[in-house]
Amino acid sequence: MASLVSGDKEAQISGDPGSKRGGWITFPFMLATLLGLSVTSFGWVMNLIVFLIEEFNIKSIAAAQISNVANGCLSMLPVVAAILADSFFGNIPVIAASSFISLLGIVLLTLIASLDYLRPRPCEAGSVLCTPPSKLHLGILYTALALVTTGAGGTRFTMASAGANQYEKPKEQGSFFNWYFLTLYAGAITGATAIVYIQDNASWKLGFGLCAAANLISFIVFVSGKRYYKHDKPMGSPFTSLIRVVVSATVKRKAVISCNEEDYHHYGLEKEVKTSAAMPSKSFRFLNRAALMTKDDLNQKEGSVNNIWRLCSVQEVEDFKAILRVFPLWLSIIFVSTPMVMQTSLIVLQALVTDRGLGPNFKVPAGSLQVIIIITACIVIIMNNWLVFPMYKKLTHKLLTPLQKVGIGQVLTILSMALSAVVEAKRLKTVENGHPMSVLWLFPPLVIVGIGEAFQFPANIELFYGEFPESLRNTATSLTSVVIGISFYLSTALIDLIQRTTAWLPNDINHGRVDNVYWLLVIGGILNFGYFLVCSWVYKYRNLKDNDQEQDPKDGTM
């Protein structure tokens, strides 16, 4: 979702309008590549916990932690890829290289599943003691996971940006994005259901082999369309100006801050282009020194900046302040995402000890349960855009702000964790009576998670895109991915802490108290929601006010 906005912006500023490359001739190449890569990435990541438990004899909690680390890398690496594409190589080379790296990783996973000596000996039926994986086994496994996560992360956001760059008209870009997300979710659902089902009921070798075939086809298709693509030119690092602000303010830390507009620098690196900000704001006043002109900062004859690391424009200073203002909200989103990703990992472990049979011949794969979140989120996003948000605007003559949407999502996330605690308590009682609980009891919490994500995920992107500096919008929208990545790492640490200090998370959760873990997450969620309300109360939007006035003149000022 983050690429929806970033790709649109990049498409308008990159590429040669007069070039014959690009256009709808690139459409099948882009979507075929996306479909294959989506099937591949979701096909292995959704069932990773089960693979580690069944094929590598790794204990359930440790498997959940490894899965969280892998998912964290999947979420963090897109930002690295976006920076590399924006600053050095462009999107097309990054996608090609990432697709090939992903192919190497999934081929190695297929070999691991095919060759017995690359895995520990399987546990004997009824045996408690199993052969643990050797250092060689783990080394090969981690190499494969590093390759597939790097490859998948390198294409997750750059595919949308590269696709948008092929079109000049915003209408065409919008049409492309509709197809882009339809294809993305189709691939995700296929990987999380069909591929996972094959892995559970046929063989891991066949499941990973199909992923490898999909990856290979997508790589060949993408490279085949290279001559038709419009190649975007790297625009330089968007973070340079931010670093310059810190350096300039530090160098001139003893300078006296002025109240006169003429004492501040109002031009960017190109002296003929004047920036929009007039006077630096009063917040974070120590940074205003970065734009304060001294006698050694300007070349009096040419009017140019002598040293760009000593003088920034007022706009560059204000851009940096905008990031600092968003940071407390960013932390709040991390703290609510951490319990959410931990919840999805624990539900997979719960599913493994439930009755997953639906009818005499079908068994729900534990790794496929998370597809409920994806399907629910898709449905609710459509309902929000076509029904809920228009109805709210009609009744109140106002639009829901991004922070209001995030708040709704946080409340729903807390409710889902509370419901998971109640369901787990019921499951433990059924285990005591000698009857496993039906897996259907796990569906309602996942549905609520999906509804909450439908409010939070687009709103987070809307918030970052609208409040970040224009020069950083391509990277800003991917910050949602960074949030998710950090949350996976924090959830891994939290699981380890709970294991060390309590008996709630043994390797056999039938003898644990996962319900207490959920209640702990509920308490943390409530505390974080209070922190979020405080941050939202004091936060002042940078751009939303004008947008609201334009969209609905009846609103007046906020």
Swiss-Prot record:
This is Protein NRT1/ PTR FAMILY 2.3. One of its GO terms (molecular function) is nitrate transmembrane transporter activity. Keywords: Membrane, Nitrate assimilation, Transmembrane, Transmembrane helix, Transport. Belongs to the major facilitator superfamily. Proton-dependent oligopeptide transporter (POT/PTR) (TC 2.A.17) family. The keyword Transmembrane helix applies. It is a multi-pass membrane protein. It comes from Arabidopsis thaliana (Mouse-ear cress). SUPFAM superfamilies: MFS general substrate transporter. The lineage of its organism: Eukaryota, Viridiplantae, Streptophyta, Embryophyta, Tracheophyta.
